[in-house]
């Protein structure tokens, strides 16, 4: 259904060459040190794989989300951290800014992304994860500025990202106007007064990107940096969720890439490992496991590419949800089954299989849990709304 064009095959080949020669050899080190791979990010930037979905008029390549997932899969297959960075530099916050921001806002963000920045999107809070609309971070209008107070949780890239897209409840004269989004820029190690990078949350997998708390203490943001105004059907929180569909497809593709890499490594082990005096590939039970894994991976790939190509500006919300559910759960199963081909040696830290299992585990949680996405899909099928409460402002006012 999605035979790649000659241009896409060339794009895939270039991505694979970079990923396998530069990122795969350092993937274990990135996992062990848990340090942000600055040198690899520079290589990614120099190859033109950051900001590639941005319009040509501002320095991007004008590539589609389908093009982007082709690249993301290759990066994630080599190194999960580089796969996630590729998503965030092409399919995350930058997509929302490109769609809803002013030309001036887009230039600020695009220039930094094209220079190698991975934007951070600040949504989740300690008590507002899947129920994101219950966020209590507030932005009070004071003249030409908004004063932001609150905290965010599990922010990918906290401490390394320059561009931050911060979502908060907007208050005008003390009245809740709904959720809006603001651009705030960190300059290297220097944060604007009031933006505090909190403690790092050490993760089970995909360890090369820091996940942190971020706190806002009277952070002052000019009104010109309000990129997603609150209220209205196509504004505020609704706009965010539409733009977020691309990030979900990207996250699912990272899971796919991790699983594809694990499968290929497991398949080689299946061919070369001997037990009971013969190759274990001769055992029908393992043959069927391999056949199922291959089928599941191909199905996930087709769902993700179908979702990436859907929609006029962003992937269709339901197609994105279905694709991410299936890809993430497939990745968890395939990585575990691939480890099984290795036996006890696959469980050891010197073997990449245990890293693949840990990396894949993230994706049934991050970017929308498998359960909340199922609720979303079911809600559309049954004509029901998500079970989100509407008392977010009551919590804000009580702070």
UniProtKB/Swiss-Prot annotation:
Substrate binds at residues 244-245. Coiled coil: none annotated. One of its GO terms (biological process) is fatty acid beta-oxidation using acyl-CoA dehydrogenase. Its EC number is 3.13.1.4. The lineage of its organism: Bacteria, Pseudomonadati, Pseudomonadota, Betaproteobacteria, Burkholderiales. Its cofactor is FAD. This is 3-sulfinopropanoyl-CoA desulfinase. The record marks 84 as: Important for activity.
């Amino acid at each position: 259904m999605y035979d790649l064009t000659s241009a896409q095959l060339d794009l895939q080949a270039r991505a694979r060459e970079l990923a396998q020669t530069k990122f795969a050899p350092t993937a274990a080190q990135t996992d062990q040190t848990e340090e942000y791979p600055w040198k690899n990010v520079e290589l990614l930037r120099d190859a033109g794989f950051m900001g590639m979905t941005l319009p040509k008029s501002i320095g991007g390549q004008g590539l589609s989300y389908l093009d982007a997932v082709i690249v993301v899969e290759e990066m994630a297959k080599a190194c999960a951290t580089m796969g996630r960075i590729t998503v965030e530099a092409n399919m995350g916050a930058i997509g929302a800014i490109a769609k809803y921001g002013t030309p001036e806002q887009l230039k600020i963000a695009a220039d930094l992304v094209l220079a190698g920045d991975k934007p951070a999107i600040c949504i989740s809070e300690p008590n507002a994860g899947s129920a994101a609309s219950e966020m209590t971070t507030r932005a009070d209008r004071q003249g030409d500025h908004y004063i932001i107070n609150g905290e965010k949780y599990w922010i990918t890239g906290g401490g390394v990202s320059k561009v931050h897209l911060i979502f908060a409840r907007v208050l005008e004269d003390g009245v809740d106007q709904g959720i809006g989004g603001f651009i705030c820029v960190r300059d290297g190690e220097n944060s604007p007064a009031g933006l505090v990078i909190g403690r790092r949350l050490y993760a089970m997998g995909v360890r090369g990107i820091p996940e942190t708390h971020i706190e806002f203490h009277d952070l002052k943001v000019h009104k010109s940096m309000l990129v997603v105004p609150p209220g209205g059907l196509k504004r505020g929180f609704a706009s965010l969720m539409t733009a977020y569909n691309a990030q979900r497809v990207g996250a699912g593709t990272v899971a796919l890439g991790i699983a594809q890499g694990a499968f290929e490594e497991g398949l080689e082990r299946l061919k070369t490992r001997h037990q009971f005096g013969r190759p274990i590939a001769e055992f029908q039970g393992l043959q069927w496991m391999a056949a199922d894994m291959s089928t599941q991976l191909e199905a996930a790939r087709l769902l993700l590419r179908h979702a990436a190509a859907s929609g006029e500006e962003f992937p269709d919300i339901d197609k994105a949800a279905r694709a991410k559910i299936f890809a993430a759960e497939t990745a968890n199963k395939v990585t575990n089954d691939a480890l099984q081909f290795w036996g006890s040696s696959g469980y050891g830290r010197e073997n990449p299989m245990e890293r693949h299992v840990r990396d894949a585990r993230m994706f049934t949680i991050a970017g929308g849990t498998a359960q909340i996405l199922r609720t979303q899909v079911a809600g559309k099928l049954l004509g029901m709304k998500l079970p989100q409460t509407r008392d977010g402002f009551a919590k804000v006012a009580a702070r």
